């Protein structure tokens, strides 16, 4: 398999967008009616759309890295392309909201990004998720969702080196080991009395979704390509559905651990 465009990935990306959008528009606490109860909890499942984004990102980035592994300027090309793709929009938003907007904002109208402005250093340094998780507080207002961008950026910093120095099979093993580590770390964190928000946003706790995508990308580049994964996917689908149903209907996860 090469880095050619896969239309199916656009459908997955669209599904992830739909899930997150539904989650944002879910109802508040229901009034006791059974259909409101189910409706609210089904839409709450849209939170898993972020995990789906992570899986897709891990798949795409790992594919790009593996396919360009023999390039002369492997690291330079990757980081330049990522920077040109991400930084102009990301830092453009921060400049607009924290530098330009305060200059022109009317003094008699409340500034809408005051909370985030006080903590903007975390935004400039891609540390939103660390601040949120450590203090157990969604404290960035309209910028709270930037936590997921921070997780991906941290992944981009370390994963290119892993792909460069490891064989395909070794990299797949790393995906499995550290994916399991992320799961166990979330459980251990809560078992040891850690706050409930950190497992949702801390970078080490979120690597399993990214590594699932990375593992799939590496497996797809082995003998048989994506077709070799079809039997495993047929088994995984009902298993995943069975794990999600309790959350959809009862709002209860099997392992009762965030993002697990």
Residues covered by each model-derived region:
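Short, Lys/Arg-rich, polar N-terminal cytosolic tail immediately upstream
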Residues: 1-8
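Hydrophobic membrane-embedded alpha-helices
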Residues: 5, 16-32, 36-66, 74-80, ...
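Mature N-terminal segment immediately following signal peptide/propeptide cleavage
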Residues: 10-11, 16
């Amino acid at each position: 398999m090469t880095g050619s465009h896969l239309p199916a990935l656009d459908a997955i990306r669209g599904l992830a967008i739909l899930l997150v959008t539904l989650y944002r528009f879910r109802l508040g606490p229901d009034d006791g009616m059974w259909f409101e109860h189910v409706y609210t909890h089904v839409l709450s499942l849209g939170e898993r759309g972020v995990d789906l984004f992570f899986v897709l990102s891990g798949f795409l980035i790992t594919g790009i890295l593996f396919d360009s592994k023999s390039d002369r300027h492997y690291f330079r090309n990757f980081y330049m392309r990522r920077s040109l793709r991400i930084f102009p929009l990301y830092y453009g938003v921060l400049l607009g909201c924290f530098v330009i907007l305060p200059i022109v904002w009317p003094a008699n109208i409340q500034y809408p990004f005051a909370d985030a402005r006080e903590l903007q250093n975390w935004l400039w340094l891609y540390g939103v998720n660390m601040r949120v998780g450590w203090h157990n507080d969604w404290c960035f207002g309209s910028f709270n969702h930037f936590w997921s961008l921070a997780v991906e950026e941290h992944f981009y910093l370390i994963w290119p080196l892993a792909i460069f120095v490891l064989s395909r099979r070794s990299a797949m093993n790393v995906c499995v080991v550290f994916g399991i580590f992320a799961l166990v770390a979330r459980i251990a964190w809560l078992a040891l009395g850690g706050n409930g928000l950190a497992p949702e946003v801390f970078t080490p706790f979120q690597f399993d979704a990214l590594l699932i995508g990375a593992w799939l990308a590496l497996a797809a580049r082995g003998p048989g390509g994506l077709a070799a994964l079809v039997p495993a996917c047929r088994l995984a689908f009902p298993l995943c559905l069975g794990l999600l149903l309790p959350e959809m209907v009862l709002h209860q996860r099997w392992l009762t651990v965030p993002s697990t």
